[in-house]
């Protein structure tokens, strides 16, 4: 595979990908919008639907305006633009969704990611550019910037280690498919190697369990005394908070993908790191 220009190489998933595949990538400096390789891998993005409470413009500026500025550099070039999107574009109650299912995003982050997908498809079809869209599910791994709105699993484990009480919206009785960041990067690399162009691929593990059971397992691993407290979903979160989130990965499996780390192994690792 030809060299890959990586936009967003300092972000969590982007930096992990660059560490795993240093011989395949060329990191693009933050202020640069041009690239010279045959493929671009675009990670630049906000990460949460919570920005609406603080800054109405950040999702639009980052996920749309900056994206279009960089996409415009592909015109009249024989390149493949690989866009990292999110399973959030499907909506806030998603079970075993396939790539062709309809999308109904509800938060500023997820709406702008879906809009970026549509703009990408329109631009690429207009100017004859090849593309791939990769929709990422729930990702876990060690991240120093954990917050309740970003890498919530790591944040919860840090609370469990301190024996702090854990508040679970609606008791945590919603399904999640968590995938280690290394496996996410492995899947991305596989799609770039073998995936068809002008296609969408879900990136997830293909297995799920309730968020409550995940937290209970982590609590048992740590021997934590944390109390799990069921709390109702706040009114302002009901429309934008993603509840069930499981993605169908038949297309990814058809490329030969399988996870190297299951969630139980991953939880043991997280409990060591946080």
Language model features: what each stretch is:
Residues 7, 43-46, 81-87, 134-136:
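SDR active-site strand-loop-helix element
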Residues 34-62, 73, 88-89:
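NAD(P)H-binding glycine-rich loop region in Rossmannoid oxidoreductase-like domains
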Residues 121-176, 181-186, 190, 217-219:
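NAD(P)-dependent short-chain dehydrogenase/reductase
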Residues 3-22:
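N-terminal Rossmann NAD(P)H-binding glycine-rich loop of SDR-like oxidoreductase domains
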Residues 112-115:
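Active-site helix of classical SDR
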Residues 162-164, 169-274:
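C-terminal substrate-binding subdomain of Rossmann-fold SDR/epimerase-dehydratase oxidoreductases
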Residues 25-37, 229, 262:
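Short acidic low-complexity segments
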Residues 68-108:
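Conserved Rossmann-fold NAD(P)-dependent oxidoreductase catalytic core, especially the SDR/UDP-sugar
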């Amino acid at each position: 595979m030809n060299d890959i220009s990586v936009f967003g190489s300092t972000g969590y998933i982007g930096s992990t990908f660059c560490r795993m595949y240093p011989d395949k990538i060329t990191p693009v400096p933050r202020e640069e919008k041009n690239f010279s390789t045959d493929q671009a891998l675009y990670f630049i993005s906000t990460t949460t639907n919570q920005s609406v409470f603080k800054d109405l413009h950040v999702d639009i500026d980052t996920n749309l305006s900056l994206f279009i500025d960089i996409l415009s550099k592909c015109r009249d070039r024989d390149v493949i633009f690989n866009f990292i999107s999110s399973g959030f574009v499907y909506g806030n109650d998603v079970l075993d969704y396939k790539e062709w299912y309809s999308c109904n995003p509800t938060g500023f982050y997820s709406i702008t990611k879906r809009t970026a997908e549509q703009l990408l498809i329109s631009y690429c079809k207009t100017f004859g550019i090849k593309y791939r869209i990769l929709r990422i599910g729930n990702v876990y791994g060690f991240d120093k910037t954990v917050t309740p709105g970003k890498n919530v699993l790591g944040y919860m484990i840090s609370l469990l280690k301190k024996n702090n009480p854990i508040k679970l919206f609606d008791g945590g009785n919603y399904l999640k498919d968590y995938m280690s960041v290394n496996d996410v990067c492995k899947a991305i690399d596989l799609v770039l190697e073998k995936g068809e162009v002008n296609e969408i691929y879900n990136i997830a593990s293909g297995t799920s369990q309730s968020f409550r059971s995940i937290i209970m397992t982590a609590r048992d691993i740590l021997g934590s005394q944390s109390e799990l407290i069921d709390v109702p979903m706040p009114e302002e979160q009901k429309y934008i908070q993603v509840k069930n989130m499981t993605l169908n990965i038949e297309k990814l499996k058809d490329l030969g993908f399988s996870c190297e780390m299951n969630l139980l192994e991953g939880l043991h690792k997280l409990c060591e790191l946080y």
